[in-house]
């Protein structure tokens, strides 16, 4: 009997550990790699030329009145990758009339009427939450943005 319970607990532990979904998206020039893990939290990390520059960092939101909070125990329904190579007309005058807009975009479509969009450019990476909530207004109580930089890294803050 004890052996059956032990085997059952091991099987449950393996199933739970497999639950975490991992996604990777690269910059168009393949120098920047963004890794995303959707488990108890939404975690991202960034590598540049194979060297880790952002260690695993959590991102999440707390929206008033929602049962499912973006980034907390995320359930990814679908993942979509788009490669964009376009030119935008410069609104603010710069040397060139147009600005090249080239990036790889990963959209994680999640249960709970929200998506997380990651964009990886040749010179950086960004994310944003996108909702399709029908309630109005939407009140964001808080947003968690961890930026766990590597030791010895310098950051310039405005």
Residue ranges, per PLM feature:
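Bacterial Sec-dependent N-terminal signal peptides
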Residues: 1-22
